Amino acid sequence: MTEIIGAARALLEAGGREGLTMRRLADEIGIRAPSLYKHLSGRPALELALVETGLEETGVALHRAVAASGSAGAGCLLDAYRAMGSAHPELYRLITAGSFPRSELLPGLEAWAGEPFYLVTGEPHLAQALWAFAHGTMILELERRFLEGSDIDLTWRAGAEAFNAASRAGRCAAGPAGEGQGVGAPALIRGEMGPR
């Protein structure tokens, strides 16, 4: 399954969602297309496996960034988020813009991957606003929608500073963000994914 997911990711990044077909994937790994169905029930299952893989990798990167961030929580989180989106733009688009059946995701995966936004802000609505800033800025950057000459690095930093200030203003007697949190994926998502 690891080889299939790796090849699928390469196809996705090379040709976008439209370029990801079972036939192309089979050709890429050197098997006949019907043999893929022993591992995945079809393209929707393949896309779901890619979304799960992407959420797991993003979650690990974000949890690590928050654990190492100290008082620069939002900045480190946004740096990690931007790095993941920039390194894997088509996977990022599939995760955030593609439609997939949420009910079929590994239980708890999406919430765990998004938890670092809450760990940084300490408040659910502020966490959602931080994610909205991160996602909106990432998509605008990927689509090259900022005005020519815009200092996008400065835009990311300004967002981080604003959210750090808002988090400090709203944080009462709560402990530091990330206190007691692990950085690895939950045990239920660490193993090899089985057939779908």
Residue ranges and their predicted role:
Residues 132-149, 163-173:
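Amphipathic C-terminal alpha-helical segment
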